[in-house]
Amino acid sequence: PVVDSLTNPIFRKEIARDWGGGNSIIGDFQQDVDRFGNTMNSFMKQCCRMAKLYGSVFVFVDNDRTIEAGQKSAIEKRQYPYLYVIKPENVTNYKCDSSGVIREIEFKCGSTYSKSFAGYKVMMDTDTWKWTPTDWQVTRHDGVVEKGKNNLGFIPVVPVFGTEHENGDLLPLSPMISIARTNLTIYNLSSELRELLRNQAFSILCYPVTEGVPIDKALSSIKVGTNDMLLFDGEVGARPFFIAPEASQAQLLQSEIQRLIDDVYRQASLSSVTAVETKASGVAKQWDFENTNQVLADMAENLEVAEKKIMKYWSAYFGEEIDYKVIYPRDFGI
């Protein structure tokens, strides 16, 4: 829910996109940007969610190796540039110049899997791509299997950042690290609470043993628990009764879990959008909203910059520039 709350408001309203409307290839591309049927809007939403989770992701603008001339043929055979996402964990090496421009990048892509006897997927091989402004190559365990010239003169990869970063640092830490650690603590506490409720929260029947019945013999087959009785040497007139542990231990765990849940939303700058009822002044609530709005606006700006660069690289494959405009929202009030 935290990542969704930092993603969905950005795409709540339709993103304004315009490229003049005269290029049919762009319109067709916008409806299927990755050859999996995802529109530009849904693709950028996926990038937003992944960037928040990982700190950054990389959008690669690739194309078929052999292209037939003519827009009609390109549309019919879907032979125009497409997009795919590279997770930061698959980036094995990169180099940037003093301006922050990527001059070299290596990443893993196109893994081959096989099913084991137990039914699990086992990775058999993977391709390692290396791109520079002048060429590219693909290597596997047995060496280079494919290579070619990069006629663009630059590497068509666009980083999408989900957090603040230094220039040239393409792999910043995820903003969700502290939240993930807190969630792990919540998971462990919830497990302890469940164990406590299962073993202790049910009353135990205490039953008096009448005079003349050996108490040791009666207890030999009894285990203390919710499915057994606890026998005791009863006096005349003693009545059965139930005992139960104090609820204070469970209440302590519940209050700590709730405190950590509130802290998760605080760390994510989402205190103003949670349903937790707290006593706060109007000024304090306004500050919370401004903080949340700024976090969303910063992410929206990152997406806007990335999408413009994606379309710039996309049009470079055709050797032309397009007047592509996109505007992401900056105000997320209700």
Map each language-model feature to its residues.
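Extended, charged amphipathic alpha-helical segments
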Residues: 145-282
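Short amphipathic alpha-helical segments
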Residues: 25, 35-43, 51, 178, ...
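C-terminal helix-loop subdomains that flank or include functional centers
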Residues: 226-233, 252, 256-334
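Conserved aromatic-histidine-acidic binding/catalytic patches
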Residues: 3, 7-12, 32, 47, ...
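Intrinsically disordered, low-complexity boundary segments flanking structured domains
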Residues: 40-49, 69-73, 78-81, 88-96, ...
